[in-house]
Each structure stands twice: as C-alpha cells, then as structure tokens.
C-alpha cells in the first residue's frame, strides 16, 4: 500500500464525520484523509458488522477510528477494518466525553499507558494497515510534559505510526 498523504486530515468527531460528511468532503478534495466517527470495538464485536463498518469506496482514503480498551476486541476490530477496505486504523485516545470515559475508552486511557500499549500491539498484530492514535496532550492530573513524553515513548515502542 502506498503511503497516505497526511498534509490534511479531517479530525474525527462524534455526530459529525458520518458517511454524508465524508462524501461531501471528498467532493472538495480527492486527497484528504477522512475518518469515520469513533466506533466502539465492543459494538463491532456484538453488533451488525456490515452496518457499522461498510462505507462507500468513493470515500477513500478513509481511516477507521476505534474506541475501546480490550486488546482482544480492538485487535479483532482492526482485522475487520482491513477486511472492509479501510486505509488506516486509528485508536481514539482523545474523546473527553463523560459517557465515553465511564465506559473506559477515549481520553481517560492516557492514565493507563501500558493498557494502551497492549491494545496497540494487538491491533498491529492483526492488520497490515498503519495503526495510529488520536490523543490529547494531557488528561486531568496527567498533564505535565514528562507525562506526555513518557506516554508517547511507550506507545512508540509498539510500532504505532
């Protein structure tokens, strides 16, 4: 697979980056990397995979953004993302929503770098696609430069892009 052009990427946002917005953005630019809304790995595991993961190939290049904290479920979701034709798999570590945090995914995982590393390692082992993260630079009391530096280095060791 050729390297994705990341000059411009449209950040994924719940209730915004749906298939209609991606179609519209693709009309404006053929090259920008688009993202799905965050899809929770548990929903993929238990739900209608086709309904959750299918997209129009005219949207490409498009990254599948996942949320979750189970290495096994995230690995399986990454595998399915490749099967459905996505160009990249992205783990959401940036969503600050209270509902998302209550379910132990999104930005709150910044407090658990070893769990995140386990999740990323499993995802990377299940796909040949690039695996990336969307993150914040801090979270609550984990907001010092040293925390960010250590967090990024732990993730980097997994091979995440």
Regions found by a protein language model. Name each.
Residues 1-8:
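Extreme N-terminal starter segment of soluble prokaryotic enzymes
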Residues 11-13, 37, 65-67, 92-94, ...:
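A cross-family glycoside hydrolase active-site/sugar-binding cleft signature
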Residues 13, 70, 96, 108, ...:
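Gly/Ser/Thr-rich beta-alpha loop segments that engage phosphate groups in nucleotides
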Residues 13-87:
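Glycine-rich, positively charged N-terminal anion/phosphate-binding segment
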Residues 23, 27-29, 75-89, 93-105, ...:
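Alpha/beta enzyme core
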Residues 51-55, 107-109, 149-151:
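Short, hinge-like loop/turn segments at secondary-structure boundaries
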Residues 67, 105-110:
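Core AdoMet radical
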């Amino acid at each position: 697979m050729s390297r994705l052009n990341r000059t411009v990427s449209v950040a994924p946002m719940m209730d915004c980056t749906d298939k209609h917005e991606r179609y519209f953005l693709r009309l404006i630019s053929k090259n920008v990397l688009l993202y799905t809304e965050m899809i929770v790995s548990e929903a993929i595991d238990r739900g209608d995979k086709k309904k959750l993961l299918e997209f129009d190939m005219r949207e490409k290049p498009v990254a599948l953004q996942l949320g979750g904290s189970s290495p096994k479920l995230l690995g399986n979701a990454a595998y399915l993302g490749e099967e459905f034709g996505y160009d990249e798999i992205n783990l959401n570590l940036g969503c600050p929503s209270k509902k998302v945090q209550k379910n132990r995914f999104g930005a709150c995982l910044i407090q658990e770098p070893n769990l995140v590393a386990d999740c990323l390692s499993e995802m990377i082992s299940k796909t040949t696609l690039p695996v990336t993260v969307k993150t914040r630079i801090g979270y609550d009391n984990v907001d010092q430069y040293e925390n960010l530096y250590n967090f990024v280095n732990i993730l980097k060791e997994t091979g995440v892009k």
